[in-house]
Curated annotation (Swiss-Prot):
Top-level taxon: Bacteria
Keyword Iron-sulfur belongs to the record: no
Name of the protein described by the UniProt record: NADH-quinone oxidoreductase subunit D
Family the UniProt entry places it in: Belongs to the complex I 49 kDa subunit family.
Gene Ontology cellular component annotations, sorted alphabetically: plasma membrane
GO-annotated molecular function: NAD binding; NADH:ubiquinone reductase (non-electrogenic) activity; quinone binding
Transmembrane segments: none
Role played: NDH-1 shuttles electrons from NADH, via FMN and iron-sulfur (Fe-S) centers, to quinones in the respiratory chain. The immediate electron acceptor for the enzyme in this species is believed to be ubiquinone. Couples the redox reaction to proton translocation (for every two electrons transferred, four hydrogen ions are translocated across the cytoplasmic membrane), and thus conserves the redox energy in a proton gradient.
Species of origin: Campylobacter jejuni subsp. jejuni serotype O:6 (strain 81116 / NCTC 11828)
Catalytic reaction annotation: a quinone + NADH + 5 H(+)(in) = a quinol + NAD(+) + 4 H(+)(out)
Pfam families associated with the record: Complex1_49kDa
Length: 408
């Protein structure tokens, strides 16, 4: 008869030192403030965190391995499920990597439509961040107001692609559809209305004593820490480093529009909140300029390259060669030349990029996603040390992670 061995406590396996004055607790993986299935193992000395370890993997779906068994076009809807709060940002980052691998240049109108989708997506993502972060701290009114405006943004996205969350709105070589009738007019109505809503949020939070106490000098990140831990996006700009990939390595038509790069020097949670609020306004500037750019573009929305992009529906139904080429693309997939490529983009949460290694077949030999939340989550190991347990939830909400792109 086999004698079962006594199981060791979990903390012995992760080399936590045991002292009588210390206590180890689990925050998550099922906890409202974890923003997904995140488990934090915290060692406390009274109320102060002396050691923290993020444990991930509860949402792992093997996306990078799945890509190796899919044709290039087939993987686009899977990218929606990474950062599911900003699906269009994932769609674009992946499509841009494949397009660079193939040497495709997308039409000008497709670039404008992509920019519109990306900036609407950025606003929707930031609104969800502000809503949930405020709710974590106890500001219920802001939560409700943010969701009110977010509904309008999601309605605009739904009017274009038919989906509110998982968009699959882009195609390799361009976009799926042109903008519907009156779309720009509705978007500009939102652009005119939203600044007043932003002022309402700031009136509720900027001088709110509780909000200031819970965010000022809490979760401080120095420049050196931000760089050493690979922080990007607002986590980097909130620490005084004025870096935005849309400015440093412009893609689409970002080099043709005027917008600022908000940043702060304090490095605390309140500074990052102010950067987010200013980013809303910069996105509105970009959307207004995109509405002007769109009117001067020719109507093409997909690149013309039979080897990589299907012809139009009319051509497929009337031309034998287009029908055969479409059949090959759908059954075997496009076949980029051998090589490897990495394309960085500025997603709402930071630098999102895809590395693709092609062996010349219809499926990628290796695909690797560089997601900002993964790096920011790892930073909890240092960022939370020295803080109080009550501030852990506030810091987690402020960092703005999503588990879908951490676990993949």
């Amino acid at each position: 008869m086999q004698i079962p061995s006594k199981l060791k406590p979990y903390y012995e396996n992760i080399a936590f030192e045991q002292e009588d004055s210390k206590m180890i607790i689990n925050l998550g993986p099922q906890h409202p403030s974890a923003h997904g299935n995140l488990r934090l193992i915290l060692e406390l000395d009274g109320e102060q965190v002396v050691k923290a370890r993020p444990c991930i993997g509860y949402m792992h779906r093997g996306m990078e391995k799945m890509a190796e068994n899919m044709i290039y076009q087939e993987f686009i809807p899977t990218t929606d499920r990474m950062d599911y709060i900003a699906a269009s940002a994932n769609n674009y980052a992946y499509c841009a990597a494949v397009e660079k691998l193939c040497g495709l240049e997308i039409p000008r109108r497709a670039a404008v439509i992509r920019m519109i989708l990306l900036e609407l997506n950025r606003i929707a993502s930031h609104l969800l961040w502000l809503a949930t972060h405020a709710l974590d701290i106890g500001a219920m009114s802001v939560f409700l107001y943010c969701f009110r405006e977010r509904e309008y943004v999601l309605d605009l996205i739904e009017k274009y692609c038919g989906a509110r969350l998982t968009h699959s709105s882009m195609r390799i070589g361009g976009v799926m559809l042109d903008l519907p009738e009156n779309y720009l007019e509705e978007m500009l109505v939102f652009c005119d209305k939203f600044p007043n809503d932003l002022k309402d949020y700031e009136d509720l939070l900027d001088d709110n004593r509780i909000w200031r106490l819970r965010t000022e000098n809490v979760g401080v990140v120095t420049k050196e820490q931000a760089l050493n831990w690979g922080c990007t996006g607002v986590m980097l700009r909130g620490s005084g480093i004025k870096y935005d990939i849309r400015k440093e390595e412009p893609y689409l038509l970002y080099n043709e529009v005027e917008f600022g790069v908000p940043y702060a020097t304090q490095g605390d949670s309140y500074a990052r909140y102010k950067v987010y609020m200013q980013e809303f306004r910069e996105s509105l500037k970009i959307l207004r300029q995109c509405a002007t750019l769109y009117k001067d573009t020719p109507p093409e929305i997909l690149a013309t390259h039979p080897e990589y992009v299907s012809a139009s529906k009319e051509q497929i139904l009337t031309q034998n060669y287009s029908l055969m080429q479409h059949f090959v693309l759908i059954t075997q997939g496009l076949k980029p030349p051998k090589g490897e490529v990495y394309v960085p983009t500025e997603s709402p949460k930071g630098e999102l990029g895809f590395f693709i290694h092609s062996d010349g077949t219809g499926r990628p030999y290796r695909l690797k996603a560089r997601t900002p939340s993964y790096w920011h989550c790892a930073f909890f190991e240092e960022m939370l040390v020295g803080t109080y347990l009550a501030d852990v939830v506030a810091i987690m909400g402020n960092v703005n992670i999503v588990l879908g792109e951490i676990d993949r």
